[in-house]
Amino acid sequence: METNSSGEDLVIKTRKPYTITKQRERWTEEEHNRFIEALRLYGRAWQKIEEHVATKTAVQIRSHAQKFFSKVEKEAEAKGVAMGQALDIAIPPPRPKRKPNNPYPRKTGSGTILMSKTGVNDGKESLGSEKVSHPEMANEDRQQSKPEEKTLQEDNCSDCFTHQYLSAASSMNKSCIETSNASTFREFLPSREEGSQNNRVRKESNSDLNAKSLENGNEQGPQTYPMHIPVLVPLGSSITSSLSHPPSEPDSHPHTVAGDYQSFPNHIMSTLLQTPALYTAATFASSFWPPDSSGGSPVPGNSPPNLAAMAAATVAAASAWWAANGLLPLCAPLSSGGFTSHPPSTFGPSCDVEYTKASTLQHGSVQSREQEHSEASKARSSLDSEDVENKSKPVCHEQPSATPESDAKGSDGAGDRKQVDRSSCGSNTPSSSDDVEADASERQEDGTNGEVKETNEDTNKPQTSESNARRSRISSNITDPWKSVSDEGRIAFQALFSREVLPQSFTYREEHREEEQQQQEQRYPMALDLNFTAQLTPVDDQEEKRNTGFLGIGLDASKLMSRGRTGFKPYKRCSMEAKESRILNNNPIIHVEQKDPKRMRLETQAST
């Protein structure tokens, strides 16, 4: 090392290795002049500048431009000259550094994105740049596409949404929507005037429906659950435009109603594709929708207004079902044409008059919404009294091929058997099991449901409310899979119910039975009480004696009693153990049992 005259060591800066190996780009005068010409012609269109320079890549041109622009700006500041006047160059303005709405901008398609360019200051023509496809320019493209997409967000917003929507909807039906213009997305968003008119129609239908339910004498009170779920319906289509416009105004859409019915599956599919739960509800409700919605006067079955009204009513039915019963399970549409439609005079006296007036699409759809709404409300009100209403049902409902309603529950017959088991008391005769079921339901719902008695007085309920109760019972049973009982469990329950007291019912259980039963009913209103003592009819008494005779072969009576009354006690509560220890200390006869706590004790001895 060389030393200074002052004796200090000279600090020699060693170059870093990567700067030694890297060769700096050399720009000749010709290339620089061509670069400046291209700047004047094309601005920041780097691909066109690359074609004009012809010896450098776009990445190299951009880095050179950055250095060149900063150099020009420094010179202009130093000399006090306006930027660009010295070299007669209009430096393109930098990109606006806005924070994007979404931090990672998504590309709308796999094709090349046409980038738009901010114009040159001196008013020369601005040409759109294209995406660079060279592999060595990946870094430049990544830097370039981010600010380009930031500036394009406002312009191409509708294009992006249209493209994304079409890519989703084209899997259902590719011919349903035209992809040529970007204004199709606006048809799927309701304007404020149309939304207010739609809400007006819905409010009128709701008020009419409340008036009709009061006239009808159903002691249900006002409906508290929401009738209408907001559904994304294509408002550009004339199905909903005729709903939102009053019938006196001419329809703004040029299509006819017959054409609308033909395009109905496309609209419904594109609408229900957004929400899969609503799609499930719509398919379930449309499988039970009557094919001919003629009320009082006979209307020809193929007339387009009724068919279009049925189309709009399917969405109304789905939303009403969704609001009333929650999410529905997947059910296949019924092959048999069952579930005969009920006459609309059941729900209100003025329904027939309105059905005869249903010449336009608006009246038909409003009426169908009222009909489905009242049907869903009856399903809700009859849900509590479903077991009590079973007394007034004909016996033919138990046979699977007797009525169309039993076809409707045929696919889920096992679920219906799980809920109310006819053979739970050891007997299959309908008279005894009906009595046991009625007694059980009355005793179970005695303390909590005061409204059951009011509904029990009205035994002349229509067929539809009972079928709705059955359907809602089946659907709620399927949605709770832990309530399902297997066949082996059902056989075990039959054996347990044939005795008076279950093995698990301790004395502590009998003391606090009412409190726990109320808690259980509040928690799970549809659950089956397993610690429930069934009353034995004479037929069941004979059955139990016969079973006892079969079991008693080869056993003495004490063994039989000990086997019948003793069961597996999985865990004992602390209060139970305290009671047992007190009983054992007071009773010297059973004092030996303290040595072996795992031995089984008779319930009769423990209670003395």
From Swiss-Prot:
**Bias (Polar residues) ranges:** 109-119, 207-223
Report keywords, A-Z. Answer: Biological rhythms, DNA-binding, Nucleus, Phosphoprotein, Transcription, Transcription regulation
A Gene Ontology molecular function term for this protein is: sequence-specific DNA binding
Q: Which residues cross the membrane?
A: none
Which GO terms of type biological process are on file? Answer: circadian rhythm; long-day photoperiodism, flowering; negative regulation of circadian rhythm; negative regulation of DNA-templated transcription; positive regulation of DNA-templated transcription; regulation of gene expression; regulation of protein-containing complex assembly; response to cold
Q: How is it modified after translation?
A: Phosphorylated at Ser-5, Ser-6, and at least at one of the position Ser-431, Ser-432, Ser-433 or Ser-484. Phosphorylation is involved in dimerization and is necessary for binding to promoters and regulation of the circadian clock.
Chief localization = nucleus
Per its UniProt record, what Pfam families does this chain match?
A: Myb_DNA-binding
- In residue numbers, the region (Disordered) covers 86-152, 188-225, 238-260, 362-483
Q: Where is the composition biased (Basic and acidic residues)?
A: 122-152, 189-206, 369-396, 406-421, 440-460
Where in this chain does the record put each HTH myb-type domain?
Answer: 19-73
Ranges of the DNA-binding region feature: 46-69
Where is it located?
A: Nucleus
UniProt tissue specificity: Expressed in leaves, roots, stems, flowers and siliques.
Q: Quote the annotated effect of S431A.
A: No effect on CKB3 binding; but loss of DNA binding
Tell me the outcome of changing S433A.
Answer: No effect on CKB3 binding, but loss of DNA binding
Output the Gene Ontology cellular-component terms.
Answer: nucleus
Domain description? The N-terminal part (11-82) is essential for DNA binding, an internal domain (136-316) is important for homodimerization and for interaction with LHY and the C-terminal part (317-608) is necessary for interaction with CKB3.
Quote the record's miscellaneous comment: CCA1 and LHY are only partially redundant, but they bind to the same region of the promoters.
Query: Quaternary state and partners of this protein?
Result: Homodimer or heterodimer with LHY. Interacts with LHY; independently of photoperiod. Probably part of a large complex. Interacts with CKB1, CKB2 and CKB3. Interacts with LNK1 and LNK2.
Tell me what this protein is called.
Answer: Protein CCA1
